Curated annotation (Swiss-Prot):
Binds 1 NADP(+) per subunit. GO terms for biological process: ADP-L-glycero-beta-D-manno-heptose biosynthetic process; lipopolysaccharide core region biosynthetic process. InterPro entries: Epimerase_deHydtase, Heptose_epim, NAD(P)-bd_dom_sf. The gene is hldD. One of its GO terms (molecular function) is ADP-glyceromanno-heptose 6-epimerase activity. Contains a large N-terminal NADP-binding domain, and a smaller C-terminal substrate-binding domain. This is ADP-L-glycero-D-manno-heptose-6-epimerase. The active site is at Y139 (proton acceptor), K183 (proton acceptor). The keyword Ion transport does not apply. Its EC number is 5.1.3.20. Homopentamer.
């Protein structure tokens, strides 16, 4: 069996879909369906069982046996970069992750987890090294701290001549694609621009968006990276982006091209995001490629075109 936490979320449900596509259906999805709209992400997927996050954690902490587990994809987290309740964030993203990690280590279960490019902050160098990390929000800090916890485990194991079972962290950059409709304000720019055009409006970007460049990665490519590491058993913390930064304008142009209408409008940059907003991200893929991962990534034009074709039928 494979366990996917956050399995009703965007990346988690797409991982379940990718597993289904290679013939794997023995999957336990763990999530919190308090936001009941997420159920739509699971309707067309084949899984063995569903379990509430709190019930799952209770069983993990009790050391309960789930039977043979081939791998755990830990995508479950509070992913709102605008959430400033640090107690809640650290409990969800740090403490819970440690519990599950140690459960997997004790049983030598491969543990593949979601980190984030939010760990980097304002740097212009995006290498998986401590000197380039400096989160701008408590979400990024929760991910940064868990990465550092994993690093300490590796260091301790090395000092004692031990080898740990597989731990693989993925620093997701700006992920977009199907199954994100439940995310509200945290959904991708492509999602919001598409909805604006469908509502008869022009697509709207923040003032200065022509200067804001991000590494936008299509969720299908994120899944390919996850499955490659599951199948090849490589440990480490790796960037999961395309290696290319493209502007928000390019995203808007791709959405406009799909619809054949619309002109970009600019709106004022929100006060609450000033000082906590990454204006530039671009994954350094040196470490990913050195590990042997040869997944090819879609450009914004290619990925948004595929996304629009799926969501607009």
């Amino acid at each position: 069996m494979i366990i996917v936490t956050g399995g009703a979320g965007m990346i988690g449900s797409n991982i379940v879909k990718a597993l289904n596509e290679i013939g794997i259906n023995d999957i336990l999805v763990v999530d919190n369906l308090k936001n009941g709209r997420k159920f739509k992400n699971l309707v067309d997927l084949d899984i063995t069982d569903y379990m509430d996050r709190d019930d799952f954690l209770t069983q993990i902490m009790a050391g309960d046996n789930f039977g043979p587990i081939e791998a755990v994809f830990h995508e479950g987290a509070c992913s709102a970069t605008t959430e400033w309740d640090g107690k809640y964030m650290m409990l969800n993203n740090y403490e819970y992750s440690k519990e599950l990690l140690h459960y997997c280590l004790e049983r030598e279960i491969p543990f593949l987890y979601a980190s984030s490019a939010a760990t980097y902050g304002e740097t212009t160098v995006f290498k998986e090294e401590r000197e380039y990390e400096g989160a701008l929000n408590v979400y990024g800090y929760s991910k940064q701290q868990f990465d550092n916890y994993v690093r300490r485990l590796w260091q301790d194991a090395e000092e004692h001549g031990e080898t740990l079972s597989q731990i693989t962290g993925f620093r997701y950059f700006n992920v977009y694609g199907p199954r994100e409709q439940h995310k509200g304000s945290m959904a991708s720019v492509a999602f919001h621009l598409n909805n604006q055009i469908l509502a008869g409006e022009n697509p709207k970007l923040f003032a200065g968006s022509e200067q804001f460049k991000r590494d936008f990665i299509y969720v299908g490519d994120v899944c390919k990276v996850n499955l490659w590491f599951m199948q090849n058993g490589v440990s480490g913390i790796f960037n999961c982006g395309t290696g290319n930064a493209e502007s928000f304008e390019e995203v808007a142009k791709a959405v406009i091209k799909h619809h054949g209408k619309g002109e970009i409008e600019t709106i004022p940059f929100p006060e609450h995001l000033k000082g906590a907003y990454q204006e530039f991200t671009q994954a350094d893929l040196t470490k990913l490629r050195a590990a042997g991962c040869d997944v090819e990534f879609k450009t914004v034009a290619e990925g948004v075109a595929e996304y629009m074709a799926i969501v607009n039928g």
